[in-house]
Design a protein with these regions (language model features):
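Intrinsically disordered, low-complexity segments enriched in serine, threonine, and glycine
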Residues: 138-286
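Short amphipathic beta-strand/extended segments with alternating polar/hydrophobic composition
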Residues: 13-22, 99-106, 205-212, 240-245
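Polar/acidic, low-complexity leader/linker segments enriched in S/T/G and N/D
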Residues: 1-40
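Oligomerization/assembly interface segments of phage tail-like spikes and tubes
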Residues: 46-69, 115-128, 258
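Short beta-strand and beta-hairpin "edge-sheet" elements
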Residues: 91-133
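Hydrophobic residues positioned within well-ordered beta-strands of beta-sheet architectures
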Residues: 61-63, 101, 119-121, 182, ...
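Short, acidic/charged, Gly/Pro-enriched secondary-structure junctions
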Residues: 66-108, 259-261
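"Short basic amphipathic alpha-helical interaction patches in structured regions
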Residues: 63, 74-82, 118-120, 135-140
């Protein structure tokens, strides 16, 4: 069994499955991985070619729906939820995955003069990956729980219920099989002028040089097509992309383990920030 839902740019959502009295989903194309484009260069007097690069093409999702019940009214509803040229979000779930993908409605064709009216909807997705509904969160400083049952506390000899562990290296695990970006949320607990987040496996680092103040929040997005750096201070959001040091890398999370550390004002022992990594698992197909 599967569930299909669409959400238009205004946030209005329509569930298309389990409503056979109105809509019956006949077929969905594009749930498999998008085709790849392989770029090669022929080599004179040699068999084959030299590999240059590869990329995934735009994903084309085509949904075929039989319109039942009040056909006129239900067809017009589809026009509202699948407006051509506009952005839509398609939610799909089955027994193993619960994902969404964003795209733009290329076409919506209906056979108006057929007794059993069908609608065929084509959605082009510039980002060809499905994303998990659930976000995964990893903090770079963790709390160690020390509270166990049964227990007793001596008034003259108290014991800690929990304590903070300041981790210089944290594993941000990518459960998927494809690279993905990450959103890094930094909360300043004191003033500082420089912070570097570094992938200790690759050596890639992202450094911000700025006069940060206590209680500032810095949000870094490394997702392709959405790269940004914003500062939230006293409730006001400011674009501080110019604070990114020139040699910085907006790193991607490879499949599996990704080890990160940080340095504040060049001091490895500085503990005056809380850092959180938020990401989604991405899939080529469902």
């Amino acid at each position: 069994m599967f569930r299909l839902e669409v959400e238009n740019a205004t946030g209005a959502a329509l569930v298309l499955t389990g409503k056979e009295a109105q809509y019956q989903v006949i077929n969905i194309e594009g749930l498999n991985p998008a085709p790849a484009q392989i770029n090669t260069t022929p080599i004179a007097n040699l068999d084959g070619a030299l590999f240059n690069s590869s990329r995934l093409d735009v994903k084309n999702i085509v949904i075929t729906i039989r319109i039942n019940g009040d056909v006129e009214r239900n067809r017009l509803r589809l026009y509202d939820y699948f407006p051509t040229k506009e952005r839509v979000t398609i939610y799909y779930s089955n027994d193993t995955r619960d994902v969404f993908i964003e795209g733009y409605v290329e076409n919506l064709e209906c056979d108006l003069f057929n007794i059993s009216e069908l609608a065929q909807i084509s959605v082009l997705c510039p980002d060809p990956y499905f994303q998990s509904i659930d976000e995964l969160v990893t903090d770079i400083s963790n709390t160690i729980a020390l509270f166990h049952f049964p227990f007793a506390i001596d008034y003259d000899d108290p014991v800690p219920i929990s304590e903070y562990e300041i981790s210089r290296i944290t594993n941000v695990y990518n459960e998927g099989s494809s690279e993905t970006g990450v959103i890094i949320d930094i909360l300043a607990k004191s003033d500082f002028s420089s912070i570097t987040i570094q992938n200790v496996q690759t050596g890639d680092g992202l450094t911000l040089d700025y006069a940060f103040l206590t209680n500032d929040e810095i949000i870094i997005n490394t997702n392709k097509g959405h790269k940004s750096v914003f500062l939230i201070r006293s409730g006001r959001s400011t674009n501080i992309f110019t604070a990114v040091r020139r040699d910085s890398v907006f790193f991607q999370l490879k499949a599996g383990d990704n080890l990160f550390g940080y340095v504040v004002n060049g001091d490895l022992q500085n503990e005056d920030v809380n850092i959180r990594f938020t990401r989604r698992t991405i899939y080529r197909g469902v």
